[in-house]
Curated annotation (Swiss-Prot):
Record protein name field: Protein MEI2-like 1
Compositionally skewed regions (Polar residues) per UniProt: 50-65, 78-89, 882-898
Compositionally biased region (Basic and acidic residues): 16-25, 705-723
Tissue: Expressed in roots, shoots, leaves, flowers and siliques.
Organism: Arabidopsis thaliana (Mouse-ear cress)
Annotated positions of the Phosphoserine modification: 76
């Protein structure tokens, strides 16, 4: 019996101990699996059946003074509970306190000894109420969680050793949160963690290349905007060396692969472009290697193994033999076979040439046998190569996010990601601080080490947790104890769980995160697709659960609304951001995420039932008052967002949100995703708030969605402009003459608005007749004038030089215009791409004078116009039949420019002009 155990330890058993042992069945973060022990039952039989791995001495404990404990060290039943003075911030729970203290709190002690045997249980003590409700609430909020430094210092110090014991991996460090998503920490946390664990160096700032990362010819480039053209990326990366391959199939998912021929070019590109701005986002570059694939060319590996070489041939002699094919990076005898020579070239083309020239060559009476191989240090072990389908290596995929995000896994491990039907391997740092991997800016969908073959049926492009019912992970088949799911709750529900004896001990937490498979299996990632795509249970909901409910931000549907007029403030847990008080109910957010919060979802914001959005803590520390400080100037409009408190309405009817991409973290502020900023109409809101006047209690300053989109787009374009981005479109004659820039499509700016296509052609033909095959002068149909710019495609890059000298920086002759022509590159390059862009455009319904013009470049008709090919799926202008477009143009009754047309009257072309 538990009382016998307590007597053996010399601790008196409280009189109420036998009646008040409660172990809740509701799963909490850090709790043991619920089916291990039924509710309201405890004792030797059930505890002894638990796996011994859950009770090892390695389970690291948090400090007693930082725990939420109701026991006194003396063990006296009359001893008062001590109060921890640590300052704590948490956004796990909403601030509803309606039924917080409806009964006495029975709090469980959390300072369980690490050497406690499997049949030992912890005692519950009854908390005596304080003098006032305010004092109880304030003290409880402040003491909910342990101190941040203590948590990370102690947990991370033990997790590495526990992981090696459980998995057999000989990792120098273990990433505490790597298997369950990225997390950012401030620099002082790095220092404290490294200092406490006695480790030096390796603390890389966010975004820098990891020291110890193995260089390779292939770079995985993250934070790539989907609207960046392929030729822009090619120009950007080609300046460092010849590119072997550019994989952009996953560009819409936020990353690309760039393979260089020379490994030195890849290193130079990684160093030069790391953290450089491209379309307003910082590039994140990692080295990666190609997975061994039979379909790949064997000559692209960059290294050779030389067999059947006479032992009298020294390495120096062999070096002289092979260096004629290219520079040799390394040449040596292999460790496992002294007769085998390993040769690595800087350039894969040199390796291919050496393979073709030396294989079968007779040297000292023996024919050389050369076998292509991957550079050592980047190949997979034979065990992983054989068992790769069984989850030997963690796998990474990218979800559909606008900015694109890259997952991080265990330091020193290699993860794979899909690209062009094949897969790539990402090499991560094997040295450095114990938490340097989970502080990256990326989120990932990962399958941890140790998953059985049944997990292979899960599509890599599909978020874990949204799989079909027939392909979900079965914990019983894995032979592991699953990590209980995370259910964010209001504070009242959280305390109720404590009252029922829910164990949130440091040992359970450290035991849980010590095994990567446990830590990741308990989280089910939901890629939220509006209201219908969200599982009612929030993050961690069972995959078989099919219930749906609307997404509520900052509120819990099971709790009552906090009185907005209350002046209650929490001394240890701030409930406002940037001095925005809680009396402003329409916007209520928390100032930072809790230290132990795990970012699992891949979307820019994670919607949790009953909790504030989980955002990286350094973002909140930037103290940018973008929330509720100035609703109109900041672009943060209540009408576009869900779960905002509305006076006179209950939280059970929150304002619905239009999409899961409500917020996005961009730079150092919180932006509203412009593509999903939807203003609910009064009719729509009336369905959400039956019996109420939904707009009566709302702020009156609502602008239209189009105006809001323009404001947000203008602010985003200003913040994203950079010199590096502009250089992509600058025309450099010297690079053209050297053959380094092969683009042919130009944008002619500052054209007088009275110029027609015929006048422009006449001016061009005076200097460069027959050198171009495409011309397009966009027309504003309102005033029948051009919009100030045109696009021309030269037949060869060399033809740009005389065209540039004839027009760039020159004034136009007609109309006494003061405009000075300037030339830049266009976004869309090449005649083929231009035709594909316009052939299905609504321009094909307009008068021929408004369409792009093509020209013959060969034969006797060179220089003459040719018909523009019509597409099979031509778009029509909204509200206007196709047949009436030409008549309307001729009668000067053209309506305003439609949203589908590529030209705009303000002088900017969203498809062809640079951003």
């Amino acid at each position: 019996m538990p009382s016998d155990i307590m007597e053996q330890r010399g601790v008196s058993t409280p009189s109420h101990f036998h009646e008040d042992i409660h172990i809740t069945s509701e799963r909490q973060f850090g709790f043991m699996k619920t089916d291990m022990m039924p509710e309201n039952q405890g004792g030797r039989d059930r505890l002894s059946s638990m796996p011994k791995s859950s009770w090892t001495s390695e389970s690291y404990q948090l400090k007693p003074q930082s725990s939420f404990s109701g026991s006194h060290p003396s063990g006296s039943p009359n001893a008062r509970n001590t109060t921890n003075g640590s300052q704590w911030e948490s956004s796990l729970f909403s601030s509803s306190m309606s039924d917080l203290f409806s009964r006495k709190l029975r709090l469980q002690g959390s300072d369980m000894l690490s050497t406690m045997s499997a049949n030992t249980v912890v005692t519950h003590r009854e908390e005596e109420p304080s003098e006032s409700l305010e004092e109880i609430e304030a003290q409880t909020i402040g003491n909910l969680l342990p101190d941040e430094d203590d948590l990370f210092a102690e947990v991370t110090g033990e997790v590495g050793r526990k992981s090696r014991a459980n998995t057999g991996d000989e990792l120098d460090e273990f990433d505490l949160f790597s298997s369950v998503g990225g997390m950012e920490l401030d620099g002082d946390i790095f220092s404290s963690v490294s200092h406490r664990n006695g480790e030096r160096g390796g603390n890389n700032s966010v975004g820098e290349l990891n020291r110890g990362e193995i260089p390779s010819r292939t770079l995985l480039v993250g934070n790539i905007s989907s609207n960046v053209e392929d030729y822009e990326l090619k120009v950007l990366f080609e300046q460092f060396g010849d590119i072997q391959a550019l994989h952009t199939a996953c560009k819409n998912r936020g990353f690309i692969m760039v393979s260089y021929c020379d490994i030195r070019a890849a290193q130079n590109a990684a160093r030069a472009l790391q953290n450089k701005l491209l379309r307003g986002t910082k590039l994140d570059i990692r080295y990666s290697i190609s997975k061994e694939n039979p379909s790949q060319k064997d000559t692209s590996k960059g290294a050779l193994l030389v067999n059947n070489l006479d032992s009298s041939i020294s390495n120096q002699e062999l070096n002289r033999l092979v260096k004629s094919y290219g520079e040799v990076k390394e040449i040596r005898r292999t460790m496992h076979d002294n007769s085998q020579i390993y040769i690595e070239f800087f350039d894969v083309r040199a390796a291919a040439a050496a393979l073709g020239g030396l294989n079968g060559l007779e040297v000292a009476g023996k024919k050389l046998q050369l076998v292509p191989t991957y550079p050592e240090g980047t190949r997979y072990t034979s065990q992983c190569a054989a068992n790769d389908t069984e989850g030997c290596l963690p796998k990474t995929s990218y979800s559909n996010t606008s900015s694109g995000h890259i997952g991080r896994h265990f330091p020193g491990m290699i993860s794979s990601t899909s690209s062009d039907g094949g897969s790539m391997r990402v090499i991560h740092n094997s040295i450095g601080s114990p938490v340097n991997s989970f502080i990256e800016r990326h989120r990932s969908l990962s399958i941890p080490i140790g998953f059985p073959p049944s997990a292979n049926g899960i599509s890599a492009s599909k978020p874990v947790g949204l799989q079909e019912h027939g392909h979900h992970f079965d914990n019983s088949n894995m032979g592991i104890q699953s990590m209980p799911n995370l259910h964010p709750h209001s504070f009242s529900e959280y305390v109720d769980n404590f009252a029922n004896g829910s164990p949130y001990t440091s040992s359970a937490f450290s035991e849980m995160v010590s095994d990567g498979s446990k830590a990741n299996e308990g989280f089910m990632i939901h890629n939220v697709r509006g209201v219908e795509g969200f599982s009612g249970g929030g993050i961690g909901s069972p995959m078989h659960q099919s219930s749906r409910r609307p997404i509520n931000l900052w509120s819990n549907s099971n709790t009552q609304q906090q009185n907005p007029s209350s002046g209650m403030m929490w001394p240890n847990s701030p409930s406002h951001i940037n001095s925005i008080p809680t009396q402003r109910p329409p916007v209520t957010v928390f100032s930072r995420a809790p230290p132990i919060m795990v970012n699992m979802a891949s979307s820019p914001v994670h919607h949790h039932i009953g909790s504030a959005p989980v955002l990286n803590s350094p973002f909140w520390d930037r103290r940018q008052a973008y929330v509720a400080e100035s609703l109109e100037s900041s672009g943060f409009h209540i009408g576009s967002h869900g779960s905002m408190g509305i006076p006179g309405s209950s939280p059970s009817h929150p304002m619905d949100i239009g999409s899961h991409k409500t917020f996005s973290v961009g730079g150092n502020r919180m932006d509203v995703n412009s593509q999903n900023a939807v203003l609910r109409s009064p009719q729509q809101l009336s369905h959400l708030f039956p019996g109420r006047s939904p707009m009566g209690s709302m702020p009156g300053s609502f602008d239209s969605p189009n105006e809001r989109y323009r404001n947000l787009s203008h602010r985003r374009s200003e913040s994203s402009s950079s010199n590096a981005d502009k250089k992509l479109y600058e025309l450099d004659v010297d690079r053209i003459l050297r053959g380094e820039d092969r683009r042919t499509t130009l944008m002619i700016k500052n054209i007088p608005n009275k110029y027609t296509s015929k006048m422009l052609l006449s001016a061009i033909d005076e200097h460069c007749k027959g050198t171009y095959d495409f011309l397009y002068l966009p027309i504003d149909f309102k005033n029948k004038c051009n919009v100030g710019y045109a696009f021309i495609n030269l037949i060869e890059p060399e033809k740009i030089v005389p065209f540039f000298k004839a027009f760039n920086g020159k004034k136009w002759e007609k109309f006494n215009s003061e405009k000075v022509a300037t030339l830049t590159y266009a976004r869309i390059q090449g005649k083929t791409a231009l035709i594909a862009h316009f052939q299905n455009s609504s321009l094909m319904n307009e008068d021929k004078r408004c369409r792009p013009i093509l020209f013959h470049t060969d034969g006797p008709n060179a220089g003459d116009q040719e018909p523009f090919p019509m597409g099979s799926n031509i778009r029509s202008r909204p509200g206007k039949p196709r047949s009436s477009s030409i008549d309307n143009y001729n009668s000067f009754s053209i309506s305003s420019v439609s949203e589908n047309r590529e030209e705009t009257p303000n002088g900017t072309d969203p498809f062809l002009k640079e951003n």
